[in-house]
Regions:
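Active-site substrate-recognition segment that forms the wall
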Residues: 79-81, 85-87, 96-193
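Helical element adjacent to the flavin cofactor pocket in flavoenzyme catalytic cores
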Residues: 8-12, 35-101
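A general structural signal for well-ordered alpha-helical segments in protein cores
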Residues: 6, 58, 180-184
Length: 193
């Protein structure tokens, strides 16, 4: 099983000071009573933590950036060039902007930005899949990893989020419905309620 296969990794983490407790099937049921009683054992990251609202964290970081004098502009960047005064010229769909320093968060779309200070990077997309189960966050007390299935299920403010499968598919590929169906079927099997 995957727990046996992960023993080297678990030992490495423990050797690095990560507190991990081995737990039995009974202990899993005590910690997470809504899980189907099919797990022979597992591990618990004793000091583990998670966000229940990742969007709120990003909003707070953005606000902190603005409070420190930054400017947040949501626009499509087309070009980025050096100017003779040492500033950067950012060409967008609606206008050109000038700044000493910029942060452009374009992810895989970065390859579509032209300009003299753009280094070509062979970047492709890693598309992640997740399924949300609204109003079901109460079913888990903490994130639960399902190593055999390659998924994590996390309780968030707006429901349970199950994620873990990815693919290299490019920017224009259509979503793979089989991956979404797989995630949903695994979650329904381990959380039958």
């Amino acid at each position: 099983n995957s727990l046996s296969a992960a023993q080297d990794d678990i030992k490495r983490r423990r050797d690095q000071g990560v507190p991990i407790t081995d737990i039995t099937s009974r202990e899993i049921q005590e910690l997470e009573p809504h899980l189907a009683p099919t797990f022979p054992g597992g591990i618990l990251f004793d000091d583990g933590f998670h966000l229940t609202n990742p969007k709120a964290l990003i909003q707070r970081l953005t606000q902190s950036f603005i409070d420190d004098g930054g400017q947040f502009i949501h626009n499509k960047v087309c070009s980025l060039n050096n100017m003779s005064n040492g500033h950067l010229k950012v060409g967008t769909h609606t206008n050109d902007l000038e700044a000493k320093r910029v942060i452009i968060a374009a992810g895989a779309w970065s390859t579509q930005i032209s300009g003299g200070c753009i280094d070509p990077v062979p970047l492709d997309t890693e598309r992640g899949y997740h399924v949300m189960f609204p109003n079901d966050a109460r079913l888990l007390n903490r994130p639960v990893g399902l190593a055999d299935a390659g998924l994590y299920i996390s309780p968030l403010d707006d429901g349970l989020r199950a994620a873990g499968t990815v693919e290299l598919a490019g920017l224009r590929a259509r979503p793979n419905q089989r991956r979404l169906n797989y995630i949903e079927s695994v979650v329904r099997r381990v959380l039958p309620e």
